[in-house]
């Protein structure tokens, strides 16, 4: 098992250039030892294609498409962490707003700013500074106005067999559906486990250095 994070690339390989550029954008390049395979007689025999990288603590190679798949997983992980942080900040902001509304002696709620929105509404009412607009009927809450529904077409894609009608042969019985669900869950758990192992190994190798 390798003790370092190593990235094998070739200057003649377009995929290598793309992966290196993506590594630079994600600020991952500094965590890998880069080795060019061009005219290099010391390349291990198991390195068959470029780009290929090895993560310390992981017993298999990330080569070709699997290398890009791993990087996409890392980007998704970073995005999820960013969204989680944004959610925490938003929750703190809402808590501060609630504190502001309850801390005053008049217990009044905050109003809305006309520079940000024309009005405010819930499922029961609509409020606006424009009294004429406020006295109108409830505003339409559909993406397509009901009066213009005939002007739009809704495209329904065909089924896998090319038909638009579901017949008995296209239906899945409960037993088959359960089997498909179990297989899908097993595949997802396996992928999540492999991804977690690679991320943990990468994080350990990063913080240990």
Curated annotation (Swiss-Prot):
This protein's source sits in the domain of life called Viruses
UniProt name for this protein: Uncharacterized protein L461
Q: What organism is the protein native to?
A: Acanthamoeba polyphaga mimivirus
């Amino acid at each position: 098992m390798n003790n370092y994070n190593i990235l094998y690339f070739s200057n003649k390989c377009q995929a290598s250039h793309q992966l290196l550029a993506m590594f630079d954008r994600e600020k991952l390049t500094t965590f890998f030892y880069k080795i060019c395979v061009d005219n290099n007689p010391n390349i291990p025999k198991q390195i068959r294609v470029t780009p290929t990288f090895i993560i310390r603590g992981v017993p298999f190679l990330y080569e070709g498409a699997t290398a890009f798949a791993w990087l996409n997983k890392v980007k998704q992980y970073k995005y999820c962490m960013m969204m989680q942080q944004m959610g925490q900040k938003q929750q703190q902001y809402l808590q501060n707003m609630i504190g502001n509304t309850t801390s005053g002696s008049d217990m009044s709620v905050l109003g809305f700013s006309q520079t940000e929105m024309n009005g405010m509404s819930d499922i029961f009412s609509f409020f606006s500074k424009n009294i004429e607009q406020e006295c109108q009927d409830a505003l339409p809450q559909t993406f397509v106005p009901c009066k213009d529904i005939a002007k739009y077409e809704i495209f329904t894609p065909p089924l896998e067999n090319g038909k638009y009608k579901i017949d008995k042969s296209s239906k899945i019985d409960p037993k088959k559906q359960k089997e498909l669900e179990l297989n899908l869950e097993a595949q997802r758990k396996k992928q999540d486990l492999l991804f977690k192992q690679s991320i943990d190994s990468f994080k350990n190798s990063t913080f240990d250095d």
